[in-house]
From Swiss-Prot:
Protein name: Maltogenic alpha-amylase
Cofactor note: Binds 3 Ca(2+) ions per subunit.
Main EC class the enzyme belongs to: hydrolase
Taxonomic placement: Bacteria, Bacillati, Bacillota, Bacilli, Bacillales
Summary of the protein's practical applications: Used in the food industry to prevent bread from staling. Sold under the name Novamyl by Novozymes.
Length: 719
């Protein structure tokens, strides 16, 4: 009995020591993939399937698309043999790395022929059939097996989905490639050249001005090789339904989420209606690629508006640009990094849903910008401890380099588990899993100069303090550092892996210390919660009856209650840190979610209840009054989706919709997501360049929205 008591005491003291000063080890066996919507504590690993690992050589040169494989791996735009089975075989490696979500490049059937010399759809972004798996990668059985095994290893699967376009074509050569051909589970639908009566594609030429919203969304992508990508018309009911069915099929096969390609290049109304239909099937995670449009550029507000209103989260290109400038080219300082953290925190309603990254398949790898591995380690440490969920491009932990496409898409060179980067990622993955401050917490700058950034993440009483010195030649004396860490001594969570040190804290002050050249130090504290604490509600948009996941702490093991705007929700499942509930039947609009457990209520978290199942509608107003440079036309109406008569155009949730486009001036149009089969009232207004508002005259327009996948509502401006 005395031995048992002593063992218990020693174990308790060791646990307390870990809480205050060291690393809580990452236990991959404790990971779970039960909640598709929840990625706050995850590390995402982005994989180009063809370039990861060849697990099945029998599909390298399939009969359906014979001759597209290059066994020498010297032709960078040919297939090189990676497949779904290869990803499955490397799940143990990914699990050891601490990965809890994999993001797969597009898996659906791609172009069966060459698009010019030695140019194939190896990357997956030239989809010809959205209902079949690409034969170089496997089949639906292979996909299902991968998803099942990933889930068994506590790893979620996000699939890249490409609804903007089909395949390459040349407007002056109908024999080139497949002419943009589209298939539905093997049945031919049409191509760019036999589309006169179908309207499956946009026929407005190629994009020349990428900052022009009309061109970017209603014209074709162009490729440096001299061809175009056939731009799909999401306003066409057949296409909208086809794409929606394809996305639903992926979810039905177990996908935990979708990364939606090129969301800035098709109308946002389709995005929102697609998200709604997917969320009705399952509480999954959706993230869109809105490339570029950083703060200060022409369409930055449109990106923010999209992220706040569409129900689709976005990849954080704003922060990515600054990360690469701060740690890569050194053209910006730590002040710029802190400023961007603050700006995005103010602009994005759900900043914790942003996906952060240092590089990806569309830009040069970090080590080709800066070959110093120490700076790579610093950049990784930042995204692994900052707000949002980090996405690590395959091979980064193996120090892969490579310039722009296609040279950033080399074959995975090794699966070495001893590299410093591998150890860094696996260790900080444990921190993300075990400390709610990283998953949900606020960010506060605690000490800064051009080279050093010390920031604190805090969620109630959980705290993580991070210090990064990007200067690999100079150390810095750190004094006057304040923190929310409790009194005590704290070891570096990374155990000195990146040159870090321990600290002592007394009454909110950190004893002076020297931060070594190039060093990264991480100190953390976590404790049990005495009251329910909501960190996240996901998805953050949907209709009554949908399932949503509430993540946080202190919910207890005895079921309490969850309310949406005071209306009690039915609980599906309840654990101490995760609750699943059904959205209650209540009025549409932004509402507050609250958890009550043990008679104590939580903090509030916003959720957007839709007015009903969504459909995307082309709203056109003809013969609008003359406008001048800087004037914009918006739509508002009597439902939250149209702003509830608001003239706020800031990009906040449920504000006025727009701005509209005018390729046929003075007629204006855009596509908005509204509840299907509902009678609505609406009006248009002009927001002049000086901020003044000019409303339409006359009575409100009244219309009943369509019940199908898409529709059109056209009115004339009332003078």
């Amino acid at each position: 009995m005395k031995k048992k008591t002593l063992s218990l005491f020693v174990g308790l003291m060791l646990l307390i020591g870990l809480l205050f000063s060291g690393s809580l080890p990452y236990n991959p066996n404790a990971a779970e993939a039960s909640s598709s919507a929840s990625v706050k504590g995850d590390v995402i690993y982005q994989i180009i399937i063809d370039r990861f690992y060849d697990g099945d050589t029998t599909n390298n040169n399939p009969a359906k698309s014979y001759g597209l494989y290059d066994p020498t791996k010297s032709k960078w735009k040919m297939y090189w043999g990676g497949d779904l089975e290869g990803v499955r075989q490397k799940l143990p490696y990914l699990k050891q790395l601490g990965v809890t979500t994999i993001w797969l490049s597009p898996v659906l059937d791609n172009l069966d022929t060459l698009a010019g010399t030695d140019n194939t759809g190896y990357h997956g972004y030239w989809t010809r059939d959205f209902k079949q798996i690409e034969e170089h990668f496997g089949n639906w059985t292979t996909f299902d097996t991968l998803v099942n095994d990933a889930h068994q290893n506590g790893i979620k699967v996000i699939v890249d989905f490409v609804p903007n376009h089909s395949t390459p074509f040349k407007a002056n050569d109908s024999t080139f490639a497949e002419g943009g051909a589209l298939y539905n589970n093997g049945t031919y639908m049409g191509n760019y050249f036999d589309d006169a009566t179908k309207g499956y594609f946009h026929h407005n030429g190629d994009i020349s001005n990428w900052d022009d919203r009309y061109e970017a969304q209603w014209k074709n992508f162009t490729d440096p090789a001299g061809f175009s990508l056939a731009d799909l018309s999401q306003e066409n009911g057949t296409i909208a339904q086809y794409l929606t069915d394809a996305a639903v099929q992926l979810v039905a096969h177990g996908a935990d989420g979708l990364r939606i390609d090129a969301v800035k290049h098709f109308n946002s109304g389709f995005s929102k209606s697609l998200a709604d239909k997917l969320y009705q099937k399952k509480d999954i995670f959706l993230v869109g690629e809105w490339y570029g449009d950083d703060p200060g550029t022409a369409n930055h507000l449109e990106k923010v508006r999209y992220a706040n209103n569409s129900g689709v989260n976005v990849l954080d290109f704003d922060l990515n640009t600054v990360i690469r400038n701060v740690f890569g080219t050194f053209t910006q300082t730590m002040y710029d990094l802190n400023n961007m953290v603050n700006q995005t925190g103010n602009e994005y309603k759900y900043k914790e849903n942003l996906i952060t990254f240092i590089d990806n398949h569309d830009m040069s790898r970090f080590l080709s910008v800066n070959s110093n591995k120490a700076n790579l380690h610093q950049a990784l440490a930042f995204i692994l401890t900052s707000r949002g969920t980090p996405s690590i491009y395959y091979g980064t932990e193996q120090y892969m380099a490579g310039g722009n496409d296609p040279y950033n898409r080399g074959m995975m060179p090794a699966f070495d588990t001893t590299t410093t980067a591998f150890k860094e990622v696996s260790t900080l993955a444990g921190l993300r899993r075990n400390n709610a401050a990283i998953q949900y917490g606020t960010t506060t700058q605690r000490w800064i100069n051009n080279d050093v950034y010390i920031y604190e993440r805090k969620f109630f009483n959980d705290v993580v303090l991070v210090a990064i010195n990007r200067n690999t030649q100079s150390s810095y004396s750190i004094s006057g550092l304040q923190t929310a860490l409790p009194n005590g001594s704290y070891a570096d969570y990374l155990s000195g892996l990146l040159g870090g040190n321990g600290i002592s804290v007394s009454n909110g002050s950190v004893a002076s210390f020297t931060l070594a050249p190039g060093a990264v130090s991480v100190w953390q504290y976590s404790t049990s919660a005495s009251a329910p604490q909501i960190g996240s509600v996901a998805p953050n948009m949907g209709i009554p009856g949908n399932v949503v996941t509430i993540d946080g702490k202190g919910f207890g093991t005895t079921q309490g209650t969850v309310t949406f705007g005071g209306v009690t929700a039915t609980v599906k499942s309840w654990t101490s840190n995760r609750i699943e509930v059904y959205v209650p039947n209540m009025a549409a609009g932004l509402t507050d979610v609250k958890v009550t457990a043990g008679g104590v209520s939580s903090n509030l978290y916003s959720y957007n209840i839709l007015s009903g199942t969504q459909t995307s509608v082309v709203f056109t107003v003809k013969s609008a009054p003359p406008t001048n440079l800087g004037d914009k036309i918006y739509l508002t109406g009597n439902i939250p989706e149209l702003g509830n008569w608001s003239t706020d155009t800031s990009g906040a949730v449920n504000n006025a919709q727009g701005p509209l486009l005018a390729p046929n001036y003075p007629d204006w149009f855009y596509v908005f997501s509204v509840p299907a089969g509902k009678t609505i009232q609406f009006k248009f207004f002009i927001k002049r360049a000086d901020g003044t508002i000019q409303w339409e005259n006359g009575s409100n327009h009244v219309a009943t929205t369509p019940t199908g996948a898409t529709g059109n509502i056209t009115v004339t401006w009332q003078n």
